[in-house]
C-alpha cells in the first residue's frame, strides 16, 4: 500500500469472498456440464454453435463481471491505480467474451433462418450489453483516462457504482430468463416431469441467484468498503476546500 500502514481486513470478508468464488466457479462448471451432458457440447461450425452463447454469457457477464465488482473489496490495500487497471481489465475480458456469445447466437439464428430479438430475454440481453459497454466506456474516460479532473470523477463516482451494481443484477436476471427459455424450448412438456436436465438446470438457476446475491451483499456492506489512502484523502480535502471557495493552501 502507498502512503501509510495497511488497513486491517474485516474478519468475515475473506470468507464471504471465498464463498462467492466457490459459487461462481461451480456455476461455470455446472453450465459446462449441462451443455456437455444434455446439449451435445460446443462447436462453432455446427448446430452446437448456439451452446457457446450461454457459456460465454455466464463466464463474461456473470462470473467475470461479478469479480470485477469485487476488486475494490478484495484488494483493499494495493495502490489505487493498480486496482483500477485490474477492475478495467476484468470488465474488458467480460465484454469480449460476452461479444463472442452474442456473435454465436446471431450467427446460429442466421444459419437456421430463425428470427432475432423477439423474446423478452433477447431484449433484456441487448439492453444489458449496451449498458455494460457504455458503463465501461464512461468509466474508462473518467477513471483511467488522464484528462478527467478529480472533481468530475468525484461527481460521477456514485452513478458509476450504482449502475455497476444495477447492470450486474440485470445480467443475472437476464441469464435466468434465458435459462428458462432454453428449458421450455428444449424440453417442452417434459419439463414438468422432473427430467434430469430440467433438475440440473434448476440447480444452475439457483446458483446464478446465489452468486448474484453473494456479490451484491459484499458490495453493499459499508464497513467492507476499500479504506481511503492518504493521497486520496488529501485530494478529497482539497476538492472540498475548493468547492467551499477557498484554496487548498490558504490555511
Curated annotation (Swiss-Prot):
GO terms for biological process: ascorbate homeostasis; electron transport chain; intracellular iron ion homeostasis. Its EC number is 7.2.1.-. Its cofactor is heme b. Binds 2 heme b groups non-covalently. The modification N-acetylmethionine is found at residue 1. GO terms for cellular component: chromaffin granule membrane; lysosomal membrane; membrane. Heme b 2 binds at residues 73, 80, 87, 160, 225. The chain crosses the membrane at residues 17-37, 52-72, 86-106, 125-145, 159-179, 199-219. Its main location: membrane. Residues 19-220 form the Cytochrome b561 domain. Residues 1-16, 73-85, 146-158, 220-251 are cytoplasmic. Expressed in many tissues, in particular the brain especially in the cortex and hippocampus. Keywords: Acetylation, Cytoplasmic vesicle, Disease variant, Electron transport, Heme, Iron, Membrane, Metal-binding, Phosphoprotein, Translocase, Transmembrane, Transmembrane helix, Transport. Heme b 1 binds at residues 53, 116-119, 121, 181. It is a multi-pass membrane protein. GO terms for molecular function: metal ion binding; oxidoreductase activity; transmembrane monodehydroascorbate reductase activity. It comes from the Eukaryota. Transmembrane reductase that uses ascorbate as an electron donor in the cytoplasm and transfers electrons across membranes to reduce monodehydro-L-ascorbate radical in the lumen of secretory vesicles. It is therefore involved the regeneration and homeostasis within secretory vesicles of ascorbate which in turn provides reducing equivalents needed to support the activity of intravesicular enzymes. This is Transmembrane ascorbate-dependent reductase CYB561. The gene is CYB561.
Amino acid at each position: 500500500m502507498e502512503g501509510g500502514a495497511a488497513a486491517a481486513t474485516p474478519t468475515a470478508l475473506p470468507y464471504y469472498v471465498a464463498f462467492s468464488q466457490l459459487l461462481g466457479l461451480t456455476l461455470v462448471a455446472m453450465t459446462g456440464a449441462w451443455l456437455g451432458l444434455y446439449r451435445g457440447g460446443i462447436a462453432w461450425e455446427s448446430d452446437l454453435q448456439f451452446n457457446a452463447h450461454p457459456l460465454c454469457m455466464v463466464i463474461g457477464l456473470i462470473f467475470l463481471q461479478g469479480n470485477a465488482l469485487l476488486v475494490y473489496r478484495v484488494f483493499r490495500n494495493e495502490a489505487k491505480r493498480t486496482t483500477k487497471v485490474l477492475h478495467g481489465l476484468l470488465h474488458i475480458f467480460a465484454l469480449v467474451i460476452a461479444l463472442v456469445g452474442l456473435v454465436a447466437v446471431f450467427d446460429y439464428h442466421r444459419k437456421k433462418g430463425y428470427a432475432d430479438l423477439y423474446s423478452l430475454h433477447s431484449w433484456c440481453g441487448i439492453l444489458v450489453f449496451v449498458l455494460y459497454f457504455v458503463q465501461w466506456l464512461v468509466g474508462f474516460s473518467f477513471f483511467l483516462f488522464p484528462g478527467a479532473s478529480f472533481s468530475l470523477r468525484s461527481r460521477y463516482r456514485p452513478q458509476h457504482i450504482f449502475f455497476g451494481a444495477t447492470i450486474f443484477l440485470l445480467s443475472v436476471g437476464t441469464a435466468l430468463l434465458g435459462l428458462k427459455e432454453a428449458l421450455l424450448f428444449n424440453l417442452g412438456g417434459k419439463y414438468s416431469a422432473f427430467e434430469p436436465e430440467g433438475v440440473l438446470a434448476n440447480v444452475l438457476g439457483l446458483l446464478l441467484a446465489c452468486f448474484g446475491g453473494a456479490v451484491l451483499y459484499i458490495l453493499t456492506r459499508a464497513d467492507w468498503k476499500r479504506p481511503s489512502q492518504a493521497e486520496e484523502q488529501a485530494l478529497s480535502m482539497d476538492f472540498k476546500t475548493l468547492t467551499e471557495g477557498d484554496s487548498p493552501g490558504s490555511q
